[in-house]
A protein has these predicted regions:
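GNAT-family acyltransferases
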Residues: 1-141, 197-208
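A short glycine-leucine-enriched loop at secondary-structure breakpoints
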Residues: 136, 145-152
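Conserved active-site alpha-helix within GNAT-family acetyltransferase domains
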Residues: 150, 175-193
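Short glycine-rich hinge loops at helix-strand junctions in the catalytic core
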Residues: 147, 164, 188
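Alpha-helical interaction/dimerization surfaces of two-component signaling modules
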Residues: 52, 159, 183-187
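Solvent-exposed beta-strand sheet faces enriched in polar/charged residues
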Residues: 104, 170-172, 192
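Conserved beta-strand-loop-alpha-helix junction that forms the acyl-donor binding cleft
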Residues: 140-141, 169-181
Length: 208
């Protein structure tokens, strides 16, 4: 049995107000487990996001993301103010956050917080970009590695492009994060060797 996604009719426009989440689809995985795909993030989702970002036992998350600083120690409101559009995958029975993704304007090749210098961090809120939009995604235990992310992110991309059809998407991260970069490749992203940072082992991939 393959994953199936059943869209929920809606007429939402972006950006959504802060702490707003609307169901846009039902996701049923290959084992028959049901999830809600949410556009936006309400306070319940953000609370889970913060808790998971602070979980130091999740070494994959801590080693490969800036979420401990971004969501655990930082302001969600400030992050959202940068034009971010979040999507959440929420397990229906337990209401647990299974995966989280976001899009938003960001200059091509601009690294995440984990890789920025102090001077670059001070400029983070002053970026002006319209053409290139970043895509970032996370999956959380115990749902990581269960075959959910490809279909979830593919659906999120299609939804986001309805609102921003001219946007060029890019992803970036640790070149050794085979799962994340492999997913990007399966989604049609292509590596940009000219943006590879050998010192920080950071790479970018684009989908134009």
């Amino acid at each position: 049995m393959a994953n199936t996604i059943t869209p929920t009719p809606h007429q939402l426009s972006l950006p959504l107000p802060l702490y707003t989440a609307e169901k846009i689809a039902t996701f049923t995985d290959s084992r028959g487990e049901s999830f809600d795909i949410m556009l936006g993030a309400d306070e319940s989702i953000v609370q889970q996001l913060r808790k998971k970002s602070l979980d130091t036992t999740d070494t994959d998350l801590q080693d490969n993301t800036s979420d401990f600083k971004r969501f655990g120690g930082g302001s969600y409101e400030e992050w959202y103010s940068k034009g971010r559009t979040p999507f959440a995958l929420v397990h229906q029975a337990s209401v647990a956050l299974a995966a989280f993704a976001w899009f938003g304007p960001k200059p091509l090749g601009r690294k995440s917080l984990k890789y920025l210098s102090e001077a670059e961090l001070k400029e983070e809120l002053n970026q002006k970009e319209k053409t290139w939009h970043t895509l970032v995604y996370r999956s959380y235990l115990p749902y990581r590695g269960k075959g959910l992310m490809g279909d979830f992110i593919r659906f999120a991309i299609a939804e986001y492009r309805k609102h921003y059809p001219e946007a060029k998407l890019w992803v970036g991260g640790n070149a050794d994060n085979a799962a994340s970069m492999g997913l990007a490749e399966r989604l049609g992203f292509k590596r940009r060797d000219d943006l590879f940072d050998a010192e920080k082992n950071w790479m970018a991939m684009v989908q134009e």
